[in-house]
Amino acid sequence: MQKRNPWPAWVLGCLALFAAGAAWALPPPPQSWQPDVDRLVADDSAHPPPQNGVLFVGSSSIRMWTDLAADFPGVPVINRGFGGSAIADSTYYADRIVIPCHPRLVVMYAGDNDIAEGDTPAQVSDAFKAFVARVRRALPDVAIAYISIKPSLARAALWPQMREANRMIADWSRQQKDVTFVDVAARMLDANGKPRAELFRADGLHMDAAGYAIWVQALKPVLARHGFAVH
C-alpha cells in the first residue's frame, strides 16, 4: 500500500469545526486518489447508481467487498471504496462520490489506515466528525453508520490505538441523530483477545468471506432500521 503523509491535525480540527456551515474549500488530500475517483465517476455515467440506497464508502476493505450486492440481496447498494484511503479522503471526495447518489444511508469503513500512518485516536475521531458534517451539509437527513476499525493480524500492534479510536467514535455517535456505530471488532477477536486468523487473507490485513460475513450480520439490523428489507 502506498504511504501518504497524515492530514495535519489543524486541518482535521478545522474540518470538524466548520464543515457544517462555512463556505470554504477543502485543502487537497496529501495523497491524491483522483484516478480511482475518476473511475468511479465514469462508471456512474455509464451505469447510473440507484438513488435512495445504501452507499458504502471508505478504504480497501470496502473496495474489495466484491460480493456486496449478493450479501444484501434486493437492497440498492453502491460501492464507493477507493485505494487505501483515510477518512479525510472520503470527506474531500464526497462531492463527487457520495452526495450525487442521494443515499438514504451511508456506511463508512475507514480509520484503519489513518492509525497505521500515525494519526492519533483523537484525529481519527475528528476526521469522522468532519465527514458527517460535510455530508450532512448537503444531505441533512441522511443516516450514517460507521463500521468499527477492525482488529487484524498485520496491525495487531496498533490495536490499542484503534480500540481507543473506536471508543471515541462510539461515544460521539451515541449523542448524534441517525449516526450509528457498528461494532464488528468483538466478533473478530478470539477468546484471548487476538484477531481470528481464519477471517483474513494471506496478507493478514484484508478479510476473506468469513470476515465479511461478520460485517453482514452486524449491518443487517442497521439497514432494517432504516427501511431496507434484509434477508
Label each region the model flagged.
Residues 25-102:
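Serine-esterase "nucleophile elbow" of acetyl-processing enzymes
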Residues 2-14:
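Bacterial N-terminal signal peptides that target proteins for export
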Residues 94, 128-133, 166, 170:
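Generic structural signal for well-ordered alpha-helices
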Residues 153-231:
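Catalytic His-Asp segment of secreted/periplasmic serine-dependent ester chemistry enzymes
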Residues 139-143:
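A short helix->loop->beta-strand "cap" motif at the edges of active sites that frequently abuts
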Residues 57-58, 81, 111, 184-185, ...:
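A secondary-structure boundary/capping signal
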Residues 62-78, 89-125, 129, 145, ...:
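Oxyanion-hole/transition-state-stabilizing segment in secreted/luminal serine hydrolases
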